[in-house]
Regions:
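A conserved regulatory-domain signal marking ACT and ACT-like small-molecule sensing domains
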Residues: 1-62
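Rossmann-fold NAD(P)-binding glycine/threonine-rich loop
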Residues: 136-151, 160-193
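Structural signal for hydrophobic packing residues in well-ordered secondary-structure cores
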Residues: 3-4, 26, 35-42, 60, ...
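Short, ordered loop/turn segments at secondary-structure junctions
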Residues: 11-15, 25, 53, 87-89, ...
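Solvent-exposed alpha-helices and their adjacent loops that cap or buttress functional pockets
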Residues: 10-12, 40-43, 74-77, 124-126, ...
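N-terminal glycine-/serine-/threonine-rich beta1-alpha1-beta2 phosphate-ribose binding loop
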Residues: 47-53, 57-150
Length: 194
């Protein structure tokens, strides 16, 4: 479910424990996945990376800010904004970004960023239940989808570039999402031209 390959697995002689070996870089993600599955946390966490903070992205972040308490209370869903980026800078924080002042934080504490370096940061964080939300119109950002999805990051795209590119690319993205057990959502593309 989390896209982590198990190198070796063994059951103890008393049949009360299971041990498995994974690559060290997947340790945190594996622990979060196991805890989420076995101990049924009080709420589900979605870790969002939002790219593009213009009209669409800015309004999305404002809606999330206003709805976070209600989503937690009524749906048991915690939307944790772990990354925000514009065309020049990115702000990344595993523990979550305060949406009350994210624009100022991005300008003062954000690191210089390109679509490629942002993709590397997202994959390097290796967080369970990650969702990359593309609110740009950039073909360079859309070109990252396959790589992100191969890293088990779901993609939600208001950007019409990927879904309206070649049919082969569209099929690749849909197949990658299906194979990886993640989401590729792009319904907002339909309204982009209206």
């Amino acid at each position: 479910r989390a896209g982590i390959s198990v190198i070796a697995c063994a059951q103890g002689a008393s049949e009360t424990n299971i041990s498995f070996v994974i690559k060290h870089k997947y340790l945190r993600k594996a622990l979060n996945s196991i805890h989420d599955s076995f101990f049924l946390s009080e709420y589900k966490v979605l870790n969002l990376f939002v790219v593009g903070i213009g009209t669409v992205g800015g309004n999305l972040l404002e809606q999330i800010r206003l709805q976070q308490p209600k989503l937690m209370e009524q749906n048991g869903l915690k939307l944790n904004i772990v990354g925000i980026a514009n065309s020049r800078k990115a702000l990344i924080c595993r523990d979550g970004i305060n949406l009350d002042n994210y624009r100022e934080e991005l300008e003062t504490n954000g690191m210089d960023s390109t679509p490629e370096t942002l993709c590397e940061q997202v994959l390097k964080m290796n967080i369970f239940n990650s969702v990359f939300v593309d609110c740009t119109a950039s073909p360079d950002v859309a070109a990252l989808y396959a790589r992100l999805m191969n890293g088990n990051v779901s993609v939600v795209a208001a950007n019409k570039e990927a879904a309206s590119s070649s049919y082969e690319n569209y099929q690749l993205l849909k197949e990658t999402a299906r194979h990886r057990g993640i989401k590729f959502l792009f319904e907002t593309n339909v309204g982009a031209g209206l």
